[in-house]
């Protein structure tokens, strides 16, 4: 057994013996000529480069085989900035270069070796760090490992044979200045002829005299590095050290080295080395790279001599220090000395002597021999080579030590603040003032201003708190009331927040506390902090936490919302996505434990609880949002009691809580997904909560079996809203191609066939996920939750994904939510209008409907407080505005004040979004890529009150500028130069206007005058600008001006620049473009910007639109708009014509009253009823051109005549004459549906007719004429499908049996009246002139979707027949059709039911002895000779106005049976009563008791110009009462009644036999007292008017109903949806469930080790379950005891122990939890049991019966009191 040990020792000794010399012969001096060239360029466009070329001599003296001394002599460099036709490595004649000396120290340095491999470099302490790194770059070329000292075990390894020459292939972990990474070695013998013909590669072929020539190739893999210096900010979270260079990332790096050696692989001489390092930049906005930085370093052996003199004496040796291995090192840029952060010497991977010791010391550098991956997670958190100490990070008053960026190391490796030659503070002040002046003067080019702002922001980032104060004092010397002072403040304010440093935050905090910023300005500023901060250290966050708790925040409007949200976002960014920040530069910025984050979350949770205690809905919403934004698992336990109904909250707030869990679900879908699923599965929960939950659950990518369950359940779920949300979400995801949803999309395709085929209207809850084929915008995410009291959604969220997505969140997010639209409408209506007259009238005389509600004693339901929010979030900032009724009152009051007084609204702001990555190149200088997206917005609008008060005038100025800077290159610290290549894009839009408005309410006229707000001068003013400028440059870092002003800047022009100009009036468009061929002006103007927006087109282009300012006076725009409405009734009825008169000569003048009257006459001719609406608009530039443009449009719908008419008139006139006229009139004769008569509907094919006349020319009467006639009808295929459908056959069978089903026949009647075919015939006098357009229209129809649209045309008869995939559904209340998808013939049986659901409108039908409610509840009813209320509105407790019903909804419908097997129906509209009855075989009408004869065409009742209602006789003889004012339609045939009510007005706002119209059929039997009855006859009797001569069963049933059990309306019932495990607690639930509780607890204990399963949160420490129960109790001071509760004469005990705090501890946090109680009568026995329990006994009550349930506040954890 001792043999292996002895052998190992012998091998160790053998290795220690210097049996070979590797590359260096002791006492020899080697001289290598050094050549370095580094260039950058946008070479995808043109091979134009900027950079430097260096040369010098590296002299190496070999002191021993483990020690070299070196010196770099005669270092020189030259600038290169030119086109190199053969690429970056082209040869440049020396005479064309102007060399300068590099200011190096020239001091010698030492190189330590081990087995021929460089281990450490030692330099004089005073040598600048930039020089050290450059020398490391040069010396690193001599790093060669021919013996596999650092080899990695790999299957591809080929070990060299003992015979010479031999080849080898292996991988090694090798360090260079660019990092310690995996290197692929390929060693091959070099042919002899190459050595003879390539003196550049083998300059001394005779040295040594024996051996062979070898070529050593090295390929560096930057994806597998153990050590790499890197600074990045704003990049995708996946861009870490290990994978930053992977393909398709922003930056990819390649390094290859060719070395030629002579000798053997054990003893050789390095003849030459050539290293090429290429860094390619591919911004996320590009499909291909835009450019590359190239670097080549060559070392060529020049001499080999014996050492003649020594460079180091004792003094020099005492001053040297180790700088570690070859990896780039950093210094303190703010220190006068170097203060280098020194790395460790390189460790040999395979040295037996050292592996046992050194690798243990530095285990994070170890590399698994079984894997080629070199990633190390520990280095990510605790990297020993981080560039800044933790102590400096804690001082938020200090400027950050940001490595590798120009302003921090550009001055000889120091911050530019250290320069003695430049007063950098003064440069900053000058730059700030320049920006302030430029944004004041509109004539300046703002593209330069934005670049100056970026430079200022970057410069301020290098400052400490004292320097910030100096800048503040400088700005304060300007009067803030002046424009210059105001602009200087805006510039400083925004630059400070975008600096994102500790001193910047302290400055902002001081502004807030001193009142320098407040209100909305302060709120906006705080919202930008988490978007801009670069170093959110724990102390930074602590300081922010103190701020949000201070009174200056909590008691200041807007700020008290913005600050907690900004803090929450900062928590998320720091703790959830920490690698977004430069953790590889500063180390992990978050705390290892969770103590602090727990403290922060607890504060937010406490504030939420405080909001509930204060009943402050704004505060509640704010902290729901804030908790959600943190995306921390702890928020689950915070929301738990509210979501489970243990603490009171509104359904709106529960919906927000579910929405707030979305960010967490994206990070830990397996944790949050089950919670969403359980919320969705609770059918007793509000549909708003369920819709939100299921949409977000689907996005968590659940298991296939669960997704199948969700899809299948849409066939059984009673909520159409929830089913709509499921179906729309799945259908959208099916079509998405986003990589992150690929797996989910495949699952959705698999389950789509299980989904209910029913299609849902647009206003149902929906989820849409849309992809964009665009290089910028990637997709759109939309979530909508429908409202119960309006067509508009209650909740809307829209997220826009783009290349600028920030921390996994969409680039832009907008949304809103409101608890009740009806409350909003009532409140705004109350505030905007005076109710005094109406209330006085209501007090003196209540309406019929209000009296009815009083008589029935209808109780209004308890309304929740009005609440809502508006949301906006982007990469620049965010805004969340929660509101309640008080905020709406304030907003309306502010708007009134704004419109009735002189006011000004103004905003000036800079915004910026940036991404940065920087790392050392193999040359030893930093590579830098920066992406900047600055935006400047300046907007101002003035309101000036005029006479009369309806007149206004003012100024509207808007300036929007944006800039995209994509720049890459390198820094040369020794000469303060930044070598840059890049592409800049600029966009500017300016709108300077003056306006005057006048509103004439009496004449219904609105007049607007607009003219440019530009001073008259002889110069032109820019309005828009767009440019793309690729360039190369060399810029001095002290030059803070734009690179376009730099003399060294050269645009990258690929061909001759084409210049074009197009002028139109005062406007001029100028184009400069770099194109490969000459293009037309029109093409450049129209397509130039769109082409340039393509990521592959980065060519030079400029497009400018200018305005000639001397023509300002001529550019006044006048717009005049007049609106009119005329009601058609008997008094103004026009002469009767069966058809619309299409031929009429109209007055052509602007704002012509005669023309409007003539159009009214044309539209109303022959109609019995209707309201004609006319809009007249004229547009002119009277001082610039003579032409005036007139647009007039009119329309009317006549319910009585069943006609819809339109009239369009357009003319161009000048100099009192018409130049061009167009007139189009159209009439549609539509057929009324017969909702109560199926036989008529199925036997009479529905058909609508259309006739349109288009005239155009000099005048309408003398020009061309086109006549279009058409119709809409059922195609034979659709007709056949309907007649043979199961629903139609079933209805026919039931009618024949005399058992007509209301539900079945209603659907069959509705579907029998849809249309799907359009027929058109065109008759034109000049047909040949329109033939081309005609064919284009047909082609468009076919092109749109040939597989769906069946388009047939007959050119000879000019006929078009279109059968489309949609059917037109006639509506009873709306002016035109709804649309539904038509099933194909192959789907007729499976899909016809879907069509039935789509065409059916919500209605209530009273049949012979049944009622079908609005919510589709069918039940038996017997009215008898007693009035029953079918439908009535009732007071909604609107703002405490008792018994008040808005005038527009004072509606009731009553019915009773009569003797002749018929019914009387009473329709109440306001104070009008319409009685419908059957007398003999005729239907009669009485209005307010007066009989009214209904003419054949119907009857109309109006009040002035307002139609109250109309009565129309339908084709089957039934009567239809239509009231568009009240939004209700009643259809009556003498026996049956069908009601249609406007959902926006009456949904969830009615009572009666028709139900409450809330989309739930289970609560339709709701009595006036808000009780639910089970027996329909008793329910119906509660709405019987028993006090009005009531005969029938109603009185007795009403008596029974009053004695029946009152079942309260079931509120939404919450259930336990969050388990202890999901809430992060030890599992205490289910103690009595099953037979294996102990095993289950054990299993849970094992699982709890994983906590929430998310390493980012360090949940292992925070999970309260620990590994077992005892650990939990010990850690959180928890003890379990049986609780005793005394209730009257009972003593109750909890059946399971309840957690409590140990003695001398107090609860840190509590949550409510329900426990079962076992109760005993109070006696001696129970009192004794109580005493023993209180003394600590633990009797087993688990098998005892449960008598009561009680809530206990149980502690989650306890701490010392």
Swiss-Prot record:
Q: Which residues form the VWFD domain?
A: 1402-1591
Q: Where do Polar residues bias regions lie?
A: 345-356
> Which intervals hold domain Vitellogenin?
24-796
A GO-annotated cellular component: extracellular region
UniProt KW keywords = Disulfide bond, Glycoprotein, Secreted, Signal, Storage protein
The residues forming the signal peptide are: 1-16
The segment annotated Disordered runs over: 336-386, 1627-1675
Q: Which cysteines are joined by disulfide bonds?
A: 181-225, 1404-1554, 1426-1590
Q: Name one GO molecular function term.
A: lipid transporter activity
User: What positions does the record give for glycosylation?
Assistant: 383, 560, 615, 1284, 1342, 1345, 1460, 1668, 1724
Database matches in Pfam families: Vit_open_b-sht (PF09172), Vitellogenin_N (PF01347), VWD (PF00094)
Q: Where is the composition biased (Low complexity)?
A: 366-378
User: Any idea where this protein resides?
Assistant: Secreted
The free-text function statement in the UniProt record for this protein reads: Precursor of the egg-yolk proteins that are sources of nutrients during embryonic development.
Q: What is this protein called?
A: Vitellogenin-3
- Protein's organism: Solenopsis invicta (Red imported fire ant)
